[in-house]
């Protein structure tokens, strides 16, 4: 069982400690306490340890150094007994913590990433069983993490315009640096004061701090600039760009930005369940509270040049946004058995959320125009303006706002549940009356209002599962839900702080309704070691909230407003099958097939020469009232005068992944093949119809010599075809290798050398495609490098004459543990194992 997540501690479970393994679907805490199966299960792997080998210490240290100043260090230490476990873990690396093994294909992480993570995790119980009077369990964790990212990104995109016109094309290059620090902690107390009552209390806290800076260049063109020679972006920013390029150029922009944010929060939850008998009757209570407070600040400088004769736009902006949020909720539930295997439930929940946000934006480029020349109200001689006075003088009231939200939510859930060994069925409906109150101020647009919205949502849901056997089941799920547009989207306000993207609200927005359907079948045959999984899902949205874009041909300015639209739906099917064959099942074959179809719609509009934007109007509109009135009408006229066409983008995706593995005592090998095909059709811009392919094939092998040496290698050819930019149609031969040697009597010390992307052909390309645009991107990443690792593993067992296995206090024989952190009832991260829930084995003598 492996977990390569850099956010988790990585530890090892030693073979000598393991008595039995048990893989099964663990019931939820609610089911264990009430006896009512709520269907919320998690596949877990319990490791049963030998009691005589408890009170043990496991300590692992992994130090790694590489070329290009790469490093990777990990540390893990844990001590456990029959009733307790405490773990310390940490890691530092600037490799993205990729781990090793298995060919690496498309979809690598973005940017050059460095991270640090340290944590403490503990659990203790008093040895009493669940539901036993006086049972007490304590636990908790504290974690610190820091991540830094250096990202270089290049993007070329095509914005679909109306029929009969060409698309708009954009190119951008950006470099950004970001860092974030996160500290969080949680305590857990589970107590059963008597056999009928269960109490769970969990306080939490967190702190986050982030910083970022970026610089970028971008340009917009009337037609595809790749039809000309050279790099479009480099050429348009040259001292003397070619006339052929400037003739199709619309604008070019340079931008610098930096920002920071801080947030602190505390919270907690409490659950109380009281059983009123052994037949499933119970009452429950849940309380939850959270408070957070923070602020963010941003600085930005933008310089925009237009190619239609319009004056250049230069902005130097600063914004400051303090924010405070708190919320609480109270939930009461009652469950009543009314027939054999039938149970009725009713729940009521009240929740309140308060959010206060004050965004102030300042145009620092206007400082030069400040004068103290008012003869009627000049300040005393010798007085200088304060920082607050200077900022107030250049405050952008038009784009500054103050908003206070108050959310009052009520929820009543009525449901019935039927459950036996074969069939589980539950259905219910939720009634959600909600009231939202928004106090909103926007001085520059003469808006000072309080808006109250009342809605009543109804959400039905149904779940059905049929258990053919312990390892074969069918499941059907349906859910319908409503979502409301945000309150600010319903206000008739304008934000033109970005001269190239002007956004508006829309008071006419309607709620959306989403239907979600899922069908699944999973099965596993332990004797044949064969597992299968098949699934189908469908999602459809009515009155979806889409973003309508009106594009100005002359300037490249985009006007954006949310609008309702119908016709968005998607469906997908996927299946997996794997099985073992040959003598002792040393061969395994696995196949994963997926299919999806997305029907995406969006509004596209264009206008020719809208004229001046609000920032130029402001130069000659002296009255704030006149300016606000003019711009509301002006921008609304942009949308009403532009013909909105519905663009339909249909995308069909199909994929197949095949893997053949062979495993022997000292050698194992695998052969892989992957094929992904995407077929997209655009109703307006048929020239943007694409058929793209991604395919790869390769092999991997591991050799383990009896003297402690091992060799691992993998190689794969990855290819792309069908992209509009020829540089994206690539062939990449990726080869990784590792050589390691273990030392000392028990092989506790290991020296390994790992080499990634030996042939230096890895690239990082991605695509986004919807009804409004097509965007292809490249970014930098950690690709080709080597690492030298020194790994030491120490296991200290207590002395015991009753076990032949405990003949030494130190042992280097090990294997990786589940989820990286052994603990009471420890669960591996992620979802169900691909082969289904394997066979259950005997109860533990001691479990961690």
Cite the ranges covered by each PLM segment.
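Short, small-residue-biased leader/transition segments that mark boundaries at the very start
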Residues: 1-14
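Primarily recognizes Gram-negative and organellar outer-membrane beta-barrels
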Residues: 8, 25-69, 84-848
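Phosphoinositide-dependent membrane-docking surfaces
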Residues: 17-24
